[in-house]
């Protein structure tokens, strides 16, 4: 077969791609750091996180009370608050600083603060305020304290409304406080818990973040092992852009295809989360999501000079990315700039799409905007990766040529010296 023929070039390209795939796959399982981020973290971290929030709710959350009012109204509020199943008035403090110290020592998870003019404002018919301070290190305790405070405040407000309305019958009081009777029935998050609301989004985000960490760490290792400190080694197998990109991408796609099915199908079943996922839908959805994450990670890997750099680039972005998806923070309250910025990351559309699939039983047709966005990201990041790797390949070849020229000049100089 002639080397100039198209068939030979195709076969040679496939052979080189398989060689790159084999080399990259071997590095994934030999490099402890990459192995941890690509295999162990996706396997173990979702189990730990799901186990923490598997109870969905917590009871008797310790709370510090700072009552500067010392009035009947503040004592009524505290009594109703302490009678709730979710929260508990554990400590009574003389100042806010004393209560803050209890929070710092983790003796309590929140503070109720009643100002000195609390009862005075109520008696004047003015709006009074109760300060609620919550420790957000655990969302379950935050939810228990905040929602209990809201419920007690609403109950007391209803009593104030009845007093000011001046009704004559119980029916008048009912109409004053609840003019329209309704029953609240949760449709999708049937338990009303934190786990069913947030954890599906976290599972999808874990796929992206661990992949970026693994690809970045592998890129840092490649630079450290390369004599010229370049991402792509100078070798006959690394002679084309597409064979390099496809060879590397195939490794992470194969690994995370398994991890994706584990996170989206196995973990929710293990902890009895609401899951309406079907095999056909999730397979079709994970294909563009994993591909977009792979090419996004390969594109960013060119920025990694050392193994440790990827930690600085990726880890701190996890919480902001979760907020910008509109899951834990209303999308309507996110500024337009940050909404546009969130479209850069595959996790934004991946989380939104998966939540609809998991909680609402949506099909691919129902999440068509997110599905299209992921395919667009796949195409854009693939082209960007090819351009970036093309530049990296040129740089590697240029440095290799310069090194070879310098070596030849040194040999010639040594020969001249020896001849003299």
Where are these regions (language model features)?
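Extracytoplasmic/periplasmic domains immediately adjacent to an N-terminal transmembrane anchor
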Residues: 1-196, 391, 397-420
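Alpha-helical membrane-protein architecture signal
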Residues: 14, 18-22, 196, 237-250, ...
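Loop-to-transmembrane-helix entry motif
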Residues: 28-35, 206, 247-253, 257, ...
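Hydrophobic core positions of alpha-helical segments in small-molecule transporters
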Residues: 37-38, 200, 246-247, 310-313, ...
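Hydrophobic alpha-helical transmembrane segments of multi-pass membrane transport proteins
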Residues: 44-47, 185-268
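Membrane-spanning alpha-helical segments of multipass transporters and channels
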Residues: 48-49, 91, 101, 254, ...
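Perimembrane helix-loop junctions in membrane proteins
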Residues: 53, 57, 220-228, 309, ...
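Hydrophobic alpha-helical segments typical of transmembrane helices
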Residues: 73-77, 148, 215, 295, ...
């Amino acid at each position: 077969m002639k080397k100039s023929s198209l068939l030979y070039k195709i076969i040679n390209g496939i052979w080189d791609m398989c060689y790159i795939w084999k080399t990259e796959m071997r590095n994934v399982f030999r490099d402890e750091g990459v192995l941890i981020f690509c295999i162990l973290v996706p396997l173990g971290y979702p189990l730990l996180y799901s186990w923490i929030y598997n109870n969905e709710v917590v009871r008797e959350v310790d709370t510090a009370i700072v009552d500067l009012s010392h009035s009947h109204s503040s004592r009524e509020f505290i009594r109703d608050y302490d009678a709730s199943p979710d929260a508990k008035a554990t400590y009574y403090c003389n100042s806010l600083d004393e209560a803050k110290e209890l929070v710092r020592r983790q003796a309590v998870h929140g503070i109720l603060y009643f100002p000195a003019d609390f009862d005075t404002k109520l008696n004047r018919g003015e709006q009074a305020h109760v300060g609620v301070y919550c420790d957000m290190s655990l969302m379950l305790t935050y939810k228990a304290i905040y929602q209990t405070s809201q419920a007690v405040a609403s109950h007391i407000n209803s009593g104030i409304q009845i007093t000011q309305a001046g009704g004559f019958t119980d029916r008048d009081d009912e109409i004053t406080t609840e003019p329209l009777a309704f029953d609240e029935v949760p449709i999708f998050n049937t338990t009303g818990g934190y786990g069913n609301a947030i954890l599906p989004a976290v599972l999808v985000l874990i796929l992206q973040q661990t992949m970026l960490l693994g690809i970045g760490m592998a890129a840092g290792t490649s630079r450290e092992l390369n004599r010229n400190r370049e991402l792509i080694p100078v070798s006959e197998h690394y002679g084309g852009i597409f064979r390099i990109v496809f060879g590397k991408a195939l490794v992470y796609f194969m690994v995370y295809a398994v991890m994706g099915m584990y996170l989206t199908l196995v973990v929710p079943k293990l902890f009895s989360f609401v899951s309406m996922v079907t095999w056909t839908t999730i397979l079709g959805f994970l294909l563009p999501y994993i591909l977009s994450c792979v090419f996004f990670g390969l594109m960013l890997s060119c920025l990694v000079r050392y193994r440790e750099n990827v930690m600085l680039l990726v880890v701190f972005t996890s919480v902001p990315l979760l907020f910008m998806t509109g899951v834990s923070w209303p999308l309507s309250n996110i500024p337009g700039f940050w909404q546009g910025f969130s479209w850069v990351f595959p996790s934004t559309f991946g989380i939104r799409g998966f939540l609809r699939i998991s909680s609402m039983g949506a099909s691919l047709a129902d999440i068509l905007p997110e599905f299209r966005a992921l395919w667009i990201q796949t195409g854009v990041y693939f082209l960007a990766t090819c351009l970036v790797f093309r530049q990296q390949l040129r740089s590697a070849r240029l440095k290799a040529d310069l090194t070879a020229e310098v070596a030849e000049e040194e040999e010639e100089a040594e020969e001249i010296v020896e001849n003299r």
